[in-house]
Amino acid sequence: MYVRRADTEDRVVLERLWLMFRHDMSEFQGQLPRPDGSYRTEWLEKVLTGDPDWAGYLFYSGESPVGFCFMRALSQPVRVLNAFFMVRPVRRNGLGLRAVREVLAHHPGPVDVAFQENNPKAVRFWHRVATEVSGDVWTSERRPIAGKPDATPDVWISFQNTTTERSTSP
């Protein structure tokens, strides 16, 4: 597996992976697709239009795209790992942790990650990431979702990222 920065040429691949990601998330957020079958895309558009405060990364196994990660708040003191997705055949074999570590190597310093408490696999995964990256020096708190007062709050993990490993293979 290798990780590379996404750019505007990756629109079709990212749009397809994004649809799978949003479909997966709908199980935990209750979000239905729009009438055209799509889901919200504002984060995707931030990455694809080159917003300087956002960065997207694609994960590949050989020639096959197997996931992505979006980072935001790049000019802020605390960066946010905003979206993370791996296709099902490559989950639970260590590639997700490896991909996150490679992305984080580009963004040292404090990092926040939000996830849904009703997603037990995400809870285990993000706790493991925080522990692998920063030992036992991380925090977890529930924060309300902006503009959605009736929604279940997200869980946010905060840690100091000191990851430096990067993939050198194409």
What is the role of each PLM region?
Residues 1-19, 25:
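A short beta-loop-alpha structural element at the N-terminal edge
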Residues 3-4, 134-142:
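Short secondary-structure junctions
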Residues 22-45:
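Conserved GNAT-fold acetyl-CoA-binding loop/helix
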Residues 43-58:
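A short helix-loop-beta-strand connector motif used in the catalytic cores of GNAT acetyltransferases and
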Residues 58, 64-73, 80, 85:
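Conserved beta-strand in the GNAT
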Residues 86, 92-105:
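Conserved acetyl-CoA-binding loop-helix of GNAT-fold acetyltransferases
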Residues 113-127, 131, 141-145, 149-150:
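Conserved beta-strand-loop-alpha-helix junction that forms the acyl-donor binding cleft
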Residues 141-170:
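Acyl-donor (CoA/ACP) binding surface of acyl/acetyltransferases
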